[in-house]
């Protein structure tokens, strides 16, 4: 199956509506990622078909839970999920933060080539970031408690944290400090026969 067909069928299965131009931009991002990945090792996934499933569709699966408002992608890496969500939500502002200069250089190039005026790329650590966003999204890089400890300084009473995790998080939710409340949502990613969970946390 072509990359375009895999993407289109996946978008339909997720119940989303993305224009031909948006889908073209997403495939252009995959092309760019494949090209840069040969020299810079941005992702362990090498196969473009897998990139469509594990990067594009995996990121788009959270779109239904993404509210309006400025969004900070912490540890964006090669721009996942931030670039993908920014293509899907062109009217929404995204800040993509990562401490790896090699990866932020790639994301800046992707921003230019894809014409993503709604994206700002920041090279730095979340501990030094000071602007409180409406919501924070990330592919989980630590336990929920550890992530919250890092992000508490930029979370207001209304800020939501959306953590994309591979496995069930019920035990982690049960051990959250009292000032936090969380819900987990099981995600189905078309073409991926692996568990995916989105945890949404905010102040109680």
Swiss-Prot record:
Alphabetized Gene3D superfamilies for the sequence: Vaccinia Virus protein VP39
InterPro entries: rRNA_ssu_MeTfrase_G (IPR003682), SAM-dependent_MTases_sf (IPR029063)
Known catalytic reactions: guanosine(527) in 16S rRNA + S-adenosyl-L-methionine = N(7)-methylguanosine(527) in 16S rRNA + S-adenosyl-L-homocysteine
Top enzyme category: transferase
Function, in words: Specifically methylates the N7 position of guanine in position 527 of 16S rRNA.
NCBIfam families on file: rsmG_gidB
Protein family: Belongs to the methyltransferase superfamily. RNA methyltransferase RsmG family.
Protein name: Ribosomal RNA small subunit methyltransferase G
Gene that encodes the chain: rsmG
